[in-house]
Amino acid sequence: MASGGAFCLIANDGKADKIILAQDLLNSRISNIKNVNKSYGKPDPEPTLSQIEETHLVHFNAHFKPYVPVGFEYNKVRPHTGTPTLGNKLTFGIPQYGDFFHDMVGHHILGACHSSWQDAPIQGTSQMGAHGQLQTFPRNGYDWDNQTPLEGAVYTLVDPFGRPIVPGTKNAYRNLVYYCEYPGERLYENVRFDVNGNSLDEYSSDVTTLVRKFCIPGDKMTGYKHLVGQEVSVEGTSGPLLCNIHDLHKPHQSKPILTDENDTQRTCSHTNPKFLSQHFPENSHNIQTAGKQDITPITDATYLDIRRNVHYSCNGPQTPKYYQPPLALWIKLRFWFNENVNLAIPSVSIPFGERFITIKLASQKDLVNEFPGLFVRQSRFIAGRPSRRNIRFKPWFIPGVINEISLTNNELYINNLFVTPEIHNLFVKRVRFSLIRVHKTQVTHTNNNHHDEKLMSALKWPIEYMFIGLKPTWNISDQNPHQHRDWHKFGHVVNAIMQPTHHAEISFQDRDTALPDACSSISDISPITYPITLPIIKNISVTAHGINLIDKFPSKFCSSYIPFHYGGNAIKTPDDPGAMMITFALKPREEYQPSGHINVSRAREFYISWDTDYVGSITTADLVVSASAINFLLLQNGSAVLRYST
């Protein structure tokens, strides 16, 4: 290895550099510190790095402080009261264990589930379906209504995978079952934290949903989905595929040409064969030597590229199956002391207090749904066209009986912190007064056309920011066949269904016709469907005592720009276009120090209004507002209370 030469660092002394680097100030300080140290007779007059850092930043100097010894351990707690079944309440007591308690996560295992066996229908019968639709298994020769003649129509029964089912067979099929999206979020309908009978904070599943939409970073979303039972797609690839590379010429042309305004072709002078051959060495004129150095670029060559297609598939709890295996859920609690270890509650300050976490569980019908296990297949032969056939499918969806899902391993994992006796005694003897942030939520029903305004009477205390969404009542209705998917979305959800028909054409001519007519088509049993969430708020306004804080701002400003600009890494822009954010703080969720608020306990005339083209007497909705409210926690006399209650 060669020896390095002299390295010379050249500092520019322009006006901007003098301000940014302040080299003269740095040199002056070093000289002054040396002179002072010499006057004191110090053997080493050179300044320390800490003295330099009083005026200049040293990028390569790390710092640390000694810290108070601390250890932590997760302790499992079983329910104190309540029967562990879906739809009930569970109460967990927080034991006197450790000096502080911080993080909490609920652990539950939902038992395996499946639907009951059902009899296959007899042809020509009808029956009321799962969502109020009449299901019909028509007679041959009739249309789907079983009344209008349709020549060439033949009907059979198949399962979701196209396998035939014999009509009239007993116990012939079962519906498939699947979980709603994010079942761990929906399982906890309401969570409350009480100390000595005083409710300090509570939140609903809507709050958990909004926290996920705005606050779970993308690099942790996969882990979060695993915890709350949301399936994660798996990536697959095709085999190698050969592609033609075109450069400024018409498709299927081997020479690079352009067409001018007179539709006359001329050679394109912009193509650089030598350049293209470096990036696409697979040359169609010499494919045997593809990838080798001796390929000679040919001006009129068609260059080739070999690629793979990427596909995604899922097989998790949201995928309909005949048998859903047990599902383990890990659900993080969202109280202020769970989010920030700096706000861990000193358990030693509440020695004889009763500390409880109460959880209201969702019912089974909100978590598990059925998918049709039987389909009616229509195969229609076109009269006079014996080679032409059209195949269509419709579901025969009669609700079955899903077995009762057990709820086991009901545990609350509590993160307990331990400190030395000296620090322990400090917290025992002193009164603690700390700033905390609690949830304030309001859900208000609306059915007014075009415009509505609601008083935020449930909100109080200084509010830093609000998450807002208008959720159609249809999204959580039992009549909605997609409520398992729509329950957490703040907008009207429509289905974009891929063209379900595949065509096959045979090139021959019928005897009776002058032109060939032998095109057959077949539909997918379950076509590919993409849900599209349409925001239902056009403009939003916020007023306090008649003063416009936000005056008819477009919803996209609150759903996209506000979370994009504010909050740093603590806030993300949601995928849901109907989820909105309004902030009164400069740095929402970024740091413990408050950076702005509006005190709605003083400004009681606090209204949110909006314009909408969706809401009406039939298409009703619920306004969901989740606010971060500032309060103060007072720990004294063995109890914990909020400083402000109104």
Curated annotation (Swiss-Prot):
Q: Where in the cell is it found?
A: Virion; Host endoplasmic reticulum membrane; Host cytoplasm, Host cytosol
Example of a GO cellular component annotation carried by this entry: membrane
* InterPro entries named among the record's database cross-references: MCP_C, MCP_C_sf, VP_dsDNA_II
> How the protein assembles, per its UniProt entry?
Homotrimer. The membrane-bound form, but not the cytosolic one, assembles into large complexes. Interacts with the minor capsid proteins M1249L and p17; these interactions form a rigid zipper structure that stabilizes the capsomers.
What is known about what this protein does? Capsid protein that self-assembles to form the pseudo-hexameric capsomers of the icosahedral capsid. The capsid is constructed of 2760 pseudo-hexameric capsomers and 12 pentameric capsomers, with a T=277 symmetry, about 200 nm in diameter. The capsid encapsulates the DNA-containing nucleoid, the core shell and the inner membrane. Plays an essential role in virion assembly. Involved in virus attachment to the host cell.
Q: Which organism is it from?
A: African swine fever virus (isolate Warthog/Namibia/Wart80/1980) (ASFV)
Expression is induced as follows: Expressed in the late phase of the viral replicative cycle.
Write out the entry's keywords from A to Z: Capsid protein, Host cytoplasm, Host endoplasmic reticulum, Host membrane, Host-virus interaction, Late protein, Membrane, Viral attachment to host cell, Virion, Virus entry into host cell
Question: Please, one GO biological process term?
Answer: virion attachment to host cell
Molecular function terms, GO-annotated: structural molecule activity
Taxonomy of origin reads: Viruses, Varidnaviria, Bamfordvirae, Nucleocytoviricota, Pokkesviricetes
Q: Per the record, a Pfam family? A: Capsid_NCLDV
Q: How does it sit in the membrane?
A: Peripheral membrane protein
Q: Which family does it belong to?
A: Belongs to the NCLDV major capsid protein family.
Full protein name: Major capsid protein
Q: Got any disulfides in this one, which pairs?
A: none
